[in-house]
Amino acid sequence: MAGTKPSDLGSLKVGQYVVIDGVACRVMDTTHSKPGKHGGAKVRLVAMGIFESVKKEHVGPASSRIDVPLIDKRKGQVLALMGENVQIMDMETYETLELPMPEDVEGIDSGVEVEYFEAMDRYKITRVISK
């Protein structure tokens, strides 16, 4: 599953995902403001990139549309540690993937079950399920 779908900017909440400038991000903060009697409400999003640690901001009318990435969460088993990369096997399809070693996840070793997700044709290991 890859790609995006449109969503209303005003309906996004903290913790949801959004695409800003072609980068898949997790929403860290939202601010609603109504400028006055005339004009629509504005929404200001502050988001952090999922795959690279970049801070992104977006301001727009609450009624406007913004892309939301389609995220597929999956389980896999670590087959091998190869320097900066980890080779995992998907537990449902049994296909093997080579993913970069995450800096923020502890306990990755051969034979460990991990959770990873795919968004916009990129993959990331999010946590260790069992050791």
From Swiss-Prot:
Sequence positions bearing Hypusine: 37
Gene Ontology BP annotations: positive regulation of translational elongation; positive regulation of translational termination
GO terms assigned for molecular function: ribosome binding; RNA binding; translation elongation factor activity; translation initiation factor activity
GO cellular component: cytoplasm
Entry keyword set: Cytoplasm, Hypusine, Initiation factor, Protein biosynthesis
Keyword Cytoplasm: yes
Role description: Functions by promoting the formation of the first peptide bond.
Family that this chain belongs to: Belongs to the eIF-5A family.
Protein name, UniProt field: Translation initiation factor 5A
